[in-house]
Amino acid sequence: MILRRSSVFSAFYLHAFLLCLRTTVSDASGHFELEILSMQNANGELQNGACCDGARNPADRKCTRDECDTYFKVCLKEYQSRVSSAGACSFGTGSTPVLGGNKFSTKGTRSEKSRIVLPFSFAWPRSYTLIVEALDFNNETASESGKLIEKAYHSGMINPNRQWQRLTHNGPVAQFEYQIRVTCLEHYYGFGCNKFCRPRDEFFGHYTCDQNGNKTCLEGWTGPDCNTAICRQGCSTEHGSCKQPGGCKCLYGWQGPYCDKCIPHPGCVHGTCVEPWQCLCDTNWGGQLCDKDLNYCGTHQPCLNGGTCSNTGPDKYQCSCEDGYSGVNCERAEHACLSNPCANGGTCKETSQGYECHCAIGWSGTSCEINVDDCTPNQCKHGGTCQDLVNGFKCACPPHWTGKTCQIDANECEDKPCVNAKSCHNLIGAYFCECLPGWSGQNCDININDCKGQCLNGGTCKDLVNGYRCLCPPGYTGEQCEKDVDECASSPCLNGGRCQDEVNGFQCLCPAGFSGQLCQLDIDYCKPNPCQNGAQCFNLASDYFCKCPDDYEGKNCSHLKDHCRTTSCQVIDSCTVAVASNSTPEGVRYISSNVCGPHGRCRSQAGGQFTCECQEGFRGTYCHENINDCESNPCRNGGTCIDKVNVYQCICADGWEGVHCEINIDDCSLNPCLNKGACQDLVNDFYCECRNGWKGKTCHSRDSQCDEATCNNGGTCHDEGDTFKCRCSPGWEGATCNIAKNSSCLPNPCENGGTCVVNGDSFNCVCKEGWEGSTCTENTNDCNPHPCYNSGTCVDGENWYRCECAPGFAGPDCRININECQSSPCAFGSTCVDEINGYRCLCPPGRIGPDCQEVVGRPCIANGQVTADGAKWEEDCNICQCQNGRIHCTMMWCGPKSCRIGKARGGCPASQSCVPIKEEQCFVKPCPSLGECWPSAPPPPSKCHASFSYQDDSCANITFTFNKENMPQGLSVEHVCNELRHWYLLKNLSTEYAVSISCEPSSSASNEIHISISTEEPRTDRSPIKDITVQIIDLVSKHNGNSTIIKAITGVRVHQIPSPKTDYLVPLLSSIFIVLWIFALASAFLWCIHRRRKQNTHSNTATSATEDNTTNNVREQLNQIKNPIEKHAAHGVPIKDYEGKNSIIAKIRTHNSEVEEEDMDKHLQKARFTKQPAYTLVEREERAPNKNPNWTNKQDNRDLETAQSLNRMEYIV
């Protein structure tokens, strides 16, 4: 889409105006400068024909007194098609001091007196009208208004430029030449000096400004504000970044100048990586760190003297030596002297290691190949250079020395080396010249430079012999240019201006309200009113302030305000947005979205479309095209048409005026012909028909038709009796050479539809909107500042731009979020939520899927809310799930809640109170203000508790040992217990059984906690308590989980139910008793039978003893394993500890079936530990039931006391 450019500026309010009254601001955005180049008043006359001073000579009618005192006055105002002197000089006025007499020229000089500077603080309109008056200063009356010598009118167009444009006025009385230019102040650019751009190189930007005021990023920076650094070329965009140009900072795991190389595993020697921390071995290298050389022969070539190398293993090799060599690397030669290895006359002698050379004099080295350096140490003295020879040396002596070792001094004064000296003195190894004053150097041939910075203020020092002379710059004098000529001595500044003396000049520091070179100008900055769009102008001391309407901003209120750049807007449609406002009761104000630019009005259409109604003078889809009102060529007589908004302006050629340049300026209106000559008007000229013998262009001479001002622009005048004829210089024509032959606009230098306007000997281009530059060659960047919202991409065109929107957005400036819910994609009563480039459906209970198209089970009502089927939530320590209308929760008793002492009920439920925990319940001290929520009546004790002795298939007791240093302070026993209730294995168990966990601190060890786990009666033969104990051991041994409490566990003791022994004695005695009663009569026989049974009993006892010995033999083999911890029971029965290296095999010996015993062994074998030291298995101990247990501390090796019968397995980390 094509849009009109819209700039964004900050808004000002009335309080900003009050602030401006106290703030010093720039007093202009540019200057109009005019400089007088030359003046020629041949006769010293005024415009009315009178002499400047005195009367005429009656004989030759020439002025008799001194010449005119000429100065100039300038009036600059808006462009006038018909120039009038009436009215104010709206753009400014100024004057020069007296510059000279009748004839003078300032060309080639740098005098500021001939220059007038008119500052302006508004957008320069380019077209202007200039009135220049040459006046005669009246020395006698010193009147402020001088007498008019000549007046020049010029209407034209000029663009800001550093180059001067030269203009010439050829009047009937005098001719003068001047030049003009318009320059913008620093940081101001554009045809109107109203584009601000200040270079910066800091956090908010790094750029300079080109000749048109556009930002040009410094090297290494990019982005709209040039604050995005360009990284080093080749820097990986995925693994590197930078904050400074040329940088490349790597992410973790990457390295290299371009961050494209991964960091290998630490210690990786001969390996590479594809991803960080890998070590992929190079060829012929192996090992975890690629440090094992698999091809030592290939990489090191250790075998010498032709030996053959064979790889025998990583970092190992073997050399097979050639005949005549031996050693590990074949480095030892056999019969080495046969090859005559000793060079340079050396004698060879064989040794056990090979050979040995006895070298001739002057040679050394293993084979006598090295020439002995006889120059070490250096034999040459006094800096002589030593040259080594065979068994000798030669010295190259420096100047002043001779001899074999440079030990003899030479007399240098014999050669008369001193030039400007009194005498020469021979020294040892040198000579000395006694120089004359002003000379230096070893030979007194250097003139001493006496210029040591004595000349001040830029003076040039000229060196003399034994002296100097200062050449002072203008403005300074004195022997060392130390005196500044005070140009302020004459007090040139007016209206209270303060004079500041400068080098060869001065500067007036004007008070508020005055300006000009001498502070002679009093300017009202609100005349003409620079504020646009109905804004009120306030004139300040040295500036003006525009109070803009709500919808405009900028220095002159010339730009539509984009409210949505600084505040959030609600998009109503493509034409309207709503912004917050205090001016309406609703708190919002509806404004235009500026889609149609500053020259159109947006009309919203159905379906999110819109149309633009253009202002007069504009057309196009977005009113971006200014209608060319110059298409009909309305300007006549060589006038140039300048297209404006719904109007045009004609810039007339010299000699023409009027709206369409249809009026020939009457050059005879000022009666230029003297002595009753008749004036005839020409185009930009006049002709005088002289009478009574008068001659010259204005009938002012008796002698000749020609004078210096007759022919213009360098033309040569020829007197032909009753008339004159001008021979014009190249490029000019006309009776007086005042018409240019070739226009500076031919051929048209302005490109891209620009209009060329002749201005003296130069031209100016009026560019079409969207183009800039001196010849309209540069396309204006309509994408600056970025006009596209929501990450849209701006495409710049010729006075237009197009926004290519990101997915999910639309509209001419990508401000409209596409509503994907308009098509109602969500079905079955669901709610559609619009998102960026998508939508989301909020499904009702019973439905799921992207569009709620899938049916699910019935919902549940939990805590007064409808919950979808399959949803899960937590209730205290339990997890609940809705399954087709029914709620299923885990059955874990959550224990008492924690609370804070001192608060109202401490956060406990209404039926409970916060009870402080006991000292022994604080596991990791201190526990300040900790409490637990309990009801007023304590619950009945459970038969399965950590402090009770009851155990069965639904109750288990476990003791955990902790490392408190790894646990946080303020941890109570109940905190630990609550953490255990959240273990996943107990969670899984609580889905099938009701589970209760209680904890009590150990009375014998401060780092132990006794824990009881109870479930409801098992529904099968297999007890869940056995499974859960095995899983707890496996969980703790592998340190699974992220819990701090699990990681702090260092030991586990699991207490199990003893297996009852099978007793055959009771049924045997019962049978015997019955038999005795039946066979009472046979007492003798029964006595015999009784005797025989006693013998059988002895036999069984011997057999049992044999079996016990066999068992003891097995245990004796196990006891051969060294055990670092040994414990003894109270009755002296030893308990053996067995230590496994990587696993634990806990064999619980019972009298149950072998299958069940093997199954239990397999479960216990899961408790494997990957770190040393390993756990220690303590064999179980059986004790009598129904007795309170006395716990044994595994850390102090104390004896076990008598306790209830139980099976105990102890694991020590």
From Swiss-Prot:
Residues 860-914 form the VWFC domain. SMART domains: DSL, EGF, EGF_CA, VWC, VWC_out. Residues 1088-1213 are cytoplasmic. Glycans are attached at N139, N214, N556, N742, N957, N988, N1042. Residues 227-260, 261-291, 293-331, 333-369, 371-407, 409-445, 447-482, 484-520, 522-558, 592-624, 626-662, 664-700, 702-738, 746-777, 779-815, 817-853, 918-956 form the EGF-like domain. GO terms for molecular function: calcium ion binding; Notch binding. Disulfide bonds join C184-C193, C197-C209, C217-C226, C231-C242, C235-C248, C250-C259, C262-C273, C268-C279, C281-C290, C297-C309, C303-C319, C321-C330, C337-C348, C342-C357, C359-C368, C375-C386, C380-C395, C397-C406, C413-C424, C418-C433, C435-C444, C451-C461, C455-C470, C472-C481, C488-C499, C493-C508, C510-C519, C526-C537, C531-C546, C548-C557, C596-C612, C614-C623, C630-C641, C635-C650, C652-C661, C668-C679, C673-C688, C690-C699, C706-C717, C711-C726, C728-C737, C745-C756, C750-C765, C767-C776, C783-C794, C788-C803, C805-C814, C821-C832, C826-C841, C843-C852. It is a single-pass type I membrane protein. This is Protein jagged-1b.
